[in-house]
Amino acid sequence: MSRIGKRPIPIPNKVTVDIDGATVTVKGPKGTLQRTLPTAVAINKDGETLLVTRQDDSRTARERHGLCRTLVANMVEGVATGFQKRLDIQGVGYRAQAQGSKLVLNVGYSKPVEMEMPDGVSVAVENSTQVIVSGIDKEAVGNTAAKIREVRPPEPYKGKGIRYLGEVVRRKVGKAGGKGAKGGKGGKK
């Protein structure tokens, strides 16, 4: 039995779960999410909890058991409380602006980078250097945050770039520029 898959999913108050065959619909105060589960697993509602079970002991059923349990648990948590990812922008002159459903990033390129947010994902900017990505779908929030970070990932020499809040960037030492840097071995004489 899967360690993760066998754990029951508690259903909080104000959240309703509808199971129609392999389709699970979760409604809550933040919105509605729907997902079709693979046929290798089944989901059952038992009072105020959900149980994910697998149909047989095949390899695919065992692989998907814990995955489906986690996906459904994330749906329940998303419609109840939502998800948030925070990004920190570091660098001289680097800043962000939220314009409706767009995010405009000034991160050292010749032109500002404009990013359109997908449906169900909202973006807010604090102090022009902190970006908050939020929504009810954990996958969409994580993907959007990763795409924002991808615009200018943190570089190891000065640490400039976009990073997740709390992310530790391994720093490197730059070139040694002391003696011999001008006319040393192999250099111009």
Curated annotation (Swiss-Prot):
Signal peptide: none annotated. Transmembrane segments: none annotated. GO terms for cellular component: cytosolic large ribosomal subunit. The keyword Metal-binding does not apply. PROSITE patterns: RIBOSOMAL_L6_1. Pfam families: Ribosomal_L6. Keywords: Ribonucleoprotein, Ribosomal protein, RNA-binding, rRNA-binding. One of its GO terms (molecular function) is structural constituent of ribosome. GO terms for biological process: cytoplasmic translation. Part of the 50S ribosomal subunit. Belongs to the universal ribosomal protein uL6 family. NCBIfam families: L6_bact. This protein binds to the 23S rRNA, and is important in its secondary structure. It is located near the subunit interface in the base of the L7/L12 stalk, and near the tRNA binding site of the peptidyltransferase center. PANTHER family: 60S/50S RIBOSOMAL PROTEIN L6/L9, LARGE RIBOSOMAL SUBUNIT PROTEIN UL6M. HAMAP family: Ribosomal_uL6_B. This is Large ribosomal subunit protein uL6. The gene is rplF.
